[in-house]
A protein has these predicted regions:
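Helix-biased detector of long, well-ordered alpha-helical tracts
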Residues: 1-267
Length: 267
């Protein structure tokens, strides 16, 4: 087996969210599926962050699954970021997470199992911080490490936040600065400073559970989680599904330090 200190990012051709199938390709496939639905269920048709299943007149269960390849080299940190990302979909719908299941792909013949332990402990650390249990999961052998979670949550039926219900003249609110994709690409190429890396890692492993605070301060009509398709991709998806257009002023966008300079270098 390889040394425990090996760089995890060298095992993936695309960093994390960049490995996602494109929205166009995904839509092409999903449009050909004739799925079963009833009045209590809502699935991928609206491209919301979670599926919804109404359990009574007051509440619904919401569920999401998310996993990706390493975007940082430290296994514990990778686990933290992957868990925070999985939980983010629940928060984007306005829900409360109840429990999680781990999803693991790991090259057991190439990497020490202690690395997998560290990844899982990273995910556990995030879940412990909000007092939700990890009740199980599923694992397979794979040449490329992958980790994420299936998260189940609950939400009041009259408080569900969807991504296709934006209204004209709505303001756009971001809970975090953007640019993590560019930073992680630069990290894989070892061309960013330790300060930039630490700042971005802190942002990525921070939970988006401030949504409830924002809801109490503003009337939120629609919400989504910005990940693999970036700000423009997700705003476009939200605007089109709401039959609107969006106007974004570059100077008003919170951006991680150093991202603009890296973008100018085609990173």
């Amino acid at each position: 087996m390889l040394n425990k200190n090996i760089k995890l990012t060298q095992f993936s051709s695309g960093a994390g969210w960049a490995s996602k199938i494109s929205a166009e390709e995904l839509t092409q496939v999903l449009s050909k599926l004739n799925s079963i639905r009833d009045n209590n269920s809502k699935g991928f048709e609206s491209l919301d962050d979670c599926c919804i299943y109404k359990i009574n007149d007051k509440e619904s269960i919401i569920q999401t699954v998310d996993f990706f390849t390493p975007i940082v080299d430290d296994p514990f940190t990778f686990g933290q970021i992957a868990a925070a990302n999985s939980l983010s979909d629940i928060y984007a719908m306005g829900g409360k997470p109840l429990f999680a299941l781990n999803i693991v792909a790991f090259p057991t013949q190439k990497l020490n199992l202690s690395i997998l332990t560290d990844i899982l402990n990273g995910g556990l650390d995030i879940c412990k911080s909000i007092n939700i249990p990890i009740l199980g999961g599923h694992s397979i052998k794979d040449d490329v490490p992958k980790y994420g979670m299936c998260v189940t949550g609950i939400i009041d039926n009259d408080k569900i936040l969807k991504n296709n219900t934006a209204k004209a003249l709505d303001d756009i609110i971001l809970t975090k600065p953007i640019g993590s994709g560019i930073i992680t690409t630069a990290l894989k190429k070892s061309i960013i400073s330790s300060k930039q890396s630490k700042q971005t890692i802190e942002i990525m492993k921070t939970l988006n559970n401030t949504v409830q605070e924002i809801i109490s301060d503003f009337k939120i009509n629609a919400c989504t989680d910005i990940t693999g398709y970036g700000l423009l991709g997700h705003i476009n998806e939200m605007a089109q599904s709401s039959k609107l257009t969006a106007e974004i002023h570059f100077d008003n966008i919170p951006i991680i330090d150093g991202v603009i300079e890296l973008a100018k270098k085609d990173i």
